[in-house]
Structure formats: C-alpha cells, structure tokens
Amino acid sequence: MQIFLDTADIEAIEERYDSGIVAGVTTNPTLVANQGINYLELIQEIAEVFPEMESISAEVKGDTAAEMIDDAAKYRDISEAVTIKLPMTKEGIKACKYFSEVGVKTNVTLCFSVAQAALAGMAGATYISPFVGRLNDNSFSGVELVRGIADLYCTQAIETKVLAASLRDVHHVSRCFLYGAKVCTLPITVSYTHLTLPTTLSV
C-alpha cells in the first residue's frame, strides 16, 4: 500500500515527502505546460531532488507505439524511478508490451473498465490507473471498478499494481485501498485532508 502525489509542485512534494510515506509522483504534461514549466526539466528536477523516489510517472506523446517509444527515450536515462505513462489505447498497449520486455516501468492510464485493465495486465504494465472521479462524474462507480480490477488481478495472478487516480476526497482514498488498490495518487488538496484530519488535530 503506497501513496503517490499527483502534482508538479516541487515544494508541495518536499513538504509531504518528509512524512516518509510518499513513494512516487504522477504528472500531467498539459497542466505543467499551462504553468509555463518545461516538462522534461521538471521530471529531471524531481528525480534529482528525490533520488529515493520509487516511481516518477512521465507521460509520453505520440499516436503510434513507435512514436511513444521514441518520445520515451529522453526520460529513460534520467533515473530508474522514471515510469513511462502510456494511454489505454491499442498503440499504448503495444508500447507497454515493448517496455515490459526491455525492463522499463510503465503506467497505463485512462482506464475505465476491467476489460481494459486485463489488456494492460497481459501487456506487462507495472501500474494500471483507473480514473475514479472521472467515472463518478459519468454516473459510474469508480471505486467498484478498482475492486473489479483488483479481483481480476488476484484471480489471474497478474502482477500489475492498481494505481487509483482522479481521487476527489479522502473517502475515495480509503475505499480504493480497502477494495484492493496498491497505490493511490493524491492531488495536493486531498493530501492535505488525508494527512491532517480535523478530528485528530482537535484532540
């Protein structure tokens, strides 16, 4: 059971990393670009500032598996912690299979069904990221998807870890861990409330 942070804010990562329970970071290049930050330099900085980080997800660009593999080259030499973030598409799965065969960690993202998670598992993904909050926005239960994927992986002895993403509140976090997620990646707003519950502070 691990906590990742879903942010590009180095100071926010430092503040929470000191707790000793943050094992990784997930990033979104679109949001990073909107902040005027160079994405490659950000990944390099995170790896330098937090050398013991287990996983730093770096999202690649490309419409084909070959393009994704080529784009990933600039991240692979940064650190062994770098995990290549791939889309849940046919080409993304092809790229995932390649990376698993050469020993590169992968995070297959934008997962919205157990069937998709099965494909990622068969391709050897290190992590699968079901988008809990995004599913809830469309009247589906994101935490139930987490449970379904975890059950599938357990039944079939698939080593891919469920990395619950798009978490909106602490209840999402608790239920995802309860239902079998190995990792929850928390936005900064959720990490504040998750790590500092008002009822605890008032005692």
At which residue positions do the language-model features occur?
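Glycine-enriched alpha-helix->loop->beta-strand junction motifs that scaffold or abut catalytic
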Residues: 21-24, 78-81, 98-106, 122-128, ...
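Catalytic cores of alpha/beta
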Residues: 16, 71, 115-119, 169-181
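Catalytic beta/alpha-barrel core
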Residues: 6, 57-61, 81-89, 105-116, ...
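Conserved anion-binding
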Residues: 53, 94, 108-161, 168-172
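Conserved, mostly hydrophobic/aromatic
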Residues: 28, 84, 120, 176
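Active-site-adjacent beta->alpha loops and helix N-cap segments on the catalytic face
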Residues: 34-43, 65-67, 86-100, 114-119, ...
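Active-site beta->alpha loop and helix N-cap motifs at the rims of alpha/beta catalytic domains
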Residues: 9-12, 19, 32-33, 38-91
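Conserved small/polar residues in nucleotide/adenosyl-binding loops
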Residues: 193-199
